[in-house]
Swiss-Prot record:
Enzyme type, top EC level: lyase
GO biological process, any: response to oxidative stress
Cofactor(s) listed: pyridoxal 5'-phosphate
Catalytic reaction list: (1S,2R)-1-C-(indol-3-yl)glycerol 3-phosphate + L-serine = D-glyceraldehyde 3-phosphate + L-tryptophan + H2O
Self-association state and partner proteins as the record states: Tetramer of two alpha and two beta chains.
Cited Pfam families: PALP
Protein name stated in the entry: Tryptophan synthase beta chain 1, chloroplastic
Domain of life according to the entry: Eukaryota
GO cellular component: chloroplast; chloroplast stroma; plasma membrane
Composition bias, Low complexity: 12-22
Length: 470
């Protein structure tokens, strides 16, 4: 696989210089009050969790499709996508975030960094990942008159470690080395980001601590073993719901306490600026390759993009390249759990309200008092009560569509795709695959659908075996 410009480099999507922390910490919000979910208290005696709001003075202006790409694709200098995003963090972290932002901009034009990243993505990660025509899945959705859409799978499951997560982990590990940080922390839900982070830490000789909810550790025991085998310390989190939200909170506590020596490799397009922008740009290789491969295969663009959405990194990696191609539909699929009316789901964009969690304003699952509602999904990677702020922005602007799939529907897709294509999907990916059952009957003949096959399902086989009779 040849390294190409599409698969080996990233470029920062914001051209303006980062704002100083003094500018970022004293702004008052002009918007009506939103629900604020505070972070848990720090264990550091010297640190306090104050709220730093970075919302600008003017509310966002609604944008028409096809408008200025800078408005569609870039956060502003405060790290906002419309009213979403920002930096709601303790003062302790402001310098670290500003330092990270400055380094990100600098490395975007650093040829040595780009060459090193390109080499690792090609030779270690195994990019570029194939755009695979799913012949039997396509046949499954063919109607009686012989018409139907054409299904292509962007095979991120074939990356080293078995998911898209390695794209971001490699790049952030290289960035941490440039910052002189030798201690790495990360949160994980399904374990794929934890495995990817442990992998790159082993590769670069960095200390690695992974925070993981105790409930997730039980259902993802294989990935826990893999992380420990790779030399990572996996710390179980028993507070709250003992899932991804709580693991993220614990990782932030650690970062506040050890900010001078530690880099936090956040695994999704969530959290305070610059993480949503930075993680998106490190995953944008997915969409760049897809554009190139589509041109090679059929001489055009995809008609429809489909990806699962928890925090939203794999979806944003695919979507970002096509945001300004307004004829390309972008569809995100959330976890409906036991059903949207059951109260046991993780459909943040479908059922959530605007609030603040883990350093950013976005849609959240919360009650009338602003307290987080416990999410549920059979998929540990989608079991999160928030979502990346850019997804919230796309929802409000109408640029992307968001739907939800139940546990039962995802399990059926898990089995169906395994038997039709000989590829065992992750439970996260199975949610996107399940949505094809609803989408494909509505599509015209020859519509080209690209689905981001975000991860393989080895990690989920034990969980699925409890539910499926095979």
């Amino acid at each position: 696989m040849a390294a190409s410009g599409t698969s080996a480099t990233f470029r920062a999507s914001v051209s303006s210089a980062p704002s100083s922390s003094s500018q970022l910490t004293h702004l008052k919000s002009p918007f009506k009050a939103v629900k604020y979910t505070p972070l848990p208290s720090s264990r550091s005696k010297s640190s306090s969790f104050s709220v730093s709001c970075t919302i600008a003075k003017d509310p966002p202006v609604l944008m028409a499709a096809g408008s200025d790409p800078a408005l569609w694709q870039r956060p502003d200098s405060f790290g906002r996508f419309g009213k979403f995003g920002g930096k709601y963090v303790p003062e302790t972290l402001m310098h670290a975030l500003s330092e990270l932002e400055s380094a990100f901009y600098a490395l975007a034009t650093d040829d040595d960094f780009q060459r090193e990243l390109a080499g690792i993505l090609k030779d270690y990660v195994g990019r570029e990942s194939p755009l695979y025509f799913a012949e039997r899945l396509t046949e499954h959705y063919r109607r009686e008159n012989g018409e139907g859409p054409l299904i292509y799978l962007k095979r991120e499951d074939l990356n080293h470690t078995g998911a898209h997560k390695i794209n971001n982990a490699v790049a952030q590990a290289l960035l941490a080395k440039r910052l002189g940080k030798k201690r790495i922390i990360a949160e994980t839900g399904a374990g794929q980001h934890g495995v990817a982070t442990a992998t790159v830490c082993a590769r670069f000789g960095l200390e690695c601590i992974i925070y993981m909810g105790a409930q997730d550790m039980e259902r993802q025991a294989l990935n826990v073993f893999r992380m420990r085998l790779l030399g990572a310390e996996v710390r179980g989190v028993h507070s709250g719901t003992a899932t991804l939200k709580d693991a993220t909170s614990e990782a932030i506590r650690d970062w506040v306490t050890n900010v001078e020596t530690t880099h936090y490799i956040l695994g999704s397009v969530a959290g305070p600026h610059p993480y949503p922008m930075m993680v998106r740009d490190f995953h944008a290789v997915i969409g760049k390759e897809t554009r190139k491969q589509a041109l090679e295969k059929w001489g055009g663009k995809p008609d429809v993009l489909v990806a699962c959405v928890g925090g939203g990194s794999n979806a944003m990696g695919l979507f970002h390249e096509f945001v300004n191609d307004t004829e390309v539909r972008m569809i995100g699929v959330e976890a409906a759990g036991f059903g949207l009316d059951s109260g046991k789901h993780a459909a943040t964009l479908t059922k959530g309200d605007v609030g603040v969690l883990h350093g950013a304003m976005s849609y959240l699952l919360q009650d009338d008092d602003g307290q987080i509602i416990e999410p549920h999904s059979i998929s540990a990677g989608l079991d999160y009560p928030g979502v990346g702020p850019e997804h919230s922005f796309f929802k409000d602007m109408g640029r992307a569509e968001y739907y939800s799939i139940t546990d039962e529907e995802a399990l059926e897709a898990f089995k169906r795709v395994s038997r039709l294509e000989g590829i065992i999907p992750a439970l996260e990916t199975s949610h996107a695959l399940a949505y094809l059952e609803k989408l494909c009957p509505t599509l015209s003949d020859g519509t080209r659908v690209v689905l981001n096959f975000s991860g393989r399902g080895d990690k989920d086989v034990q969980t699925v075996a409890k539910y499926l009779d095979v």
